[in-house]
Amino acid sequence: GPVGAVGYCWGGSAAWACATRLGIPAVGYYGGRTVQLMHERPQAPCQLHFGARDHLIPLGDVAKLRYAHQTVPMHVYEAGHGFNCDDRHGSYDKAAADLALERTLDFFKARLV
């Protein structure tokens, strides 16, 4: 069956590389190295999630990504880095995580058929 990639933090950047280098539909969460790879063009649909209060990924970097890839859905949540990880008690944000999960599942449902 169809394959997709999802990644968080370092894996978020790896998910971007899956879309740009391997042509695999991908969703990346707060991938800090994605900005360094923004010259690469997605060969498959992808979606990105970031936190507005992420101390590792400035919103200016997210703006650069948006400008370079205007057709790539990018969602920014009022949360910090690692907002999706419920083991990170200082940064987990249930509302942001739930919405990001809903968007991620909708993305894959539409593309992995």
Model-assigned labels for residue ranges:
Residues G1-A44:
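Primarily recognizes the serine-hydrolase "nucleophile elbow" in alpha/beta-hydrolase
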Residues I57-Y67:
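Short alpha-helix in the alpha/beta-hydrolase fold that links the catalytic acid
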Residues A15, L65-V72:
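Acidic/histidine-enriched, beta-strand-rich ligand/metal-binding domains
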Residues T71-V113:
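C-terminal catalytic histidine-bearing segment of alpha/beta-hydrolase fold enzymes
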Residues V27, Q47-H49, H75:
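Conserved hydrophobic packing residues within short motifs/helices of P-loop NTPase cores
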Residues R53-I57, H81:
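Acidic catalytic loop of the alpha/beta-hydrolase fold
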Residues P42, Q47-F50, D54:
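Short beta-strand/loop motif that positions the catalytic acidic residue
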